[in-house]
Amino acid sequence: MDETIYKIPESVLVVIYTPQREVLLIRRADAGTWQSVTGSKDHGAETWAETAIREVQEETGLDAQHPECHLQDWQLENVYDIYPAWRWRYHPEVSRNTERVFGLRLPQKMPITLSPSEHTEWQWLDWQAAADHCFSASNAEAILMLPRYLSEPAP
């Protein structure tokens, strides 16, 4: 009986930004590419929002539930083929991942505490420059949608 624990092919992408349209990017330790916070569900019962909150904490040290922060489910999902180099993490019959997009508005740029095993650097960039720096097309597209979410007031 195979007891291998595979990654769940459901993940989040969290665009972290300020009201001034500054976007946080973090550099992956394994590939050296820049991205927003991403990560898979830990278990099937974990909600999209729980995954987003956990991944933000793990990858940046930020508390997405802080009263001055606003986590918003952008109600967008990207479905894409899993890169061949990463397929070994998933069940052999899995080839596609569903990624739910969130935005996390901070009151201003904040210091970041990286998980060194996952990321090596962080930077705040203007939203358009951040989109240009992203390795992932879906990440860049999400960042380019930022102006529409900045016009919506926080609850």
Tell me what each language-model feature is.
Residues T18-A64:
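Conserved Nudix-box catalytic region and its N-terminal flanking loop in Nudix hydrolases
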Residues T4-Y6, V15, P92-V94, T113-S115:
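Short secondary-structure boundary/capping segments
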Residues D63-E77:
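A short coil-to-beta-strand element that immediately follows conserved catalytic motifs
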